[in-house]
Amino acid sequence: MIKVYGDIMLDRWIVGKARRISPEAPVPVLKEIEQQFCPGGAGNLAVNIANLNGEIGVYGSIASDKEGYRVIECFSNFKKINFRASLDSKKTTTKNRLVGQGGQHICRWDREEKYTGEDAFNRLLSELSENDVVCISDYAKGTVREGTIQRLLDRNCKILVDPKQNVDFYKGAYLVKPNLREFKNWFGKFSKEK
């Protein structure tokens, strides 16, 4: 089975029309039309795998706040996802976006606190089976920490990582997939001519 572990978030879009500039500051005034919610971070990875017809478990941490319950509600729409997140006292990480009707992003603000517990990882370890693949989605919010990779390697798992931290942090993983900015930070700029 595929297990996704990492920083679970809520993605929220407030979609509206921006037809004028505020008299209080040079910013657009957005008239809200609708709000949209979906799992973000490790939750987004879980949804993408489920949409490929994969059956998966998702592990991480959310809070028992309204955003955390919204994440649970979002996952209830996916029958192939076994939502195994732990509840924590921290705030559920939420990425809020103000978006005009044409898709133009006007603003984004984040609400977050670092996760400091071990419950999510201990639950993952207790439910690992032989031949499980663990996909780690690390946004450096505290879920993935020093020793995470080694403890999974000790359980003979294949580990695939979407990283945020230094490359050495993921030593031993089967696959580490940085984005271009992370790659350049780790190894420097590269030339197409070489």
Give a label for each model feature:
Residues 1-19, 34-194:
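Ribokinase/PfkB-type carbohydrate-kinase core domain
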Residues 26-33:
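Divalent-cation-assisted or electrostatically stabilized phosphate/pyrophosphate-binding catalytic cores
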